[in-house]
Amino acid sequence: MALLCLCACRSTSGTDHDQIVRTSIDLAETYRSQGRPELAVEVYDRALTQADDYRLYYNKALALADQGLYTDATELCAASFERYPYVISFKKAQALFLDLAGDKDGYFDVCLEILELNPYDFDTRTELMEAYSENDMDKEAYDQALILWNQGYMLDTIHQYLEKYNPEYWENISL
């Protein structure tokens, strides 16, 4: 029944495009909140035949991930970023889904791509530093901590990573 609602909204004007997108997201998110992400994916698929919009692709990826389809969600994010290279959220979601899928190498690669796009992304660099550390990649963790420090993030947590990996140099440097 609810899927028929989307067909009635079909039009080519910008206002109608936004109405399709908003209506679709509202309906699909209702399905997701009810624990029915497979129906949300159906809503997004139908909406995408009527309105090509980055918000639909992004939310569809979330619904795929809700089903544990991390590879599909990752591939959708990668393809969507190619179409919408200004939406860095696709790369961030792709990194998250790779991490959830246990693909550490893929996760590291995508995080580095994000940092090429925005070298001052504190959250991504910190998460990457922590992931390197958890995976016994000491040099890589140290390098990320050093970049953060040099960017002006002279925080105790960053200092702890620096001191952990190069104690001779950092033990005498205080905040």
Where are these regions (language model features)?
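TPR/TPR-like (Sel1-like) alpha-helical repeat modules
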Residues: 82, 116-119, 133-156
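Alpha-helical segment of the N-proximal tetratricopeptide repeat
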Residues: 16-53, 59-62
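Alpha-helical adaptor scaffolds
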Residues: 55-68, 75-116
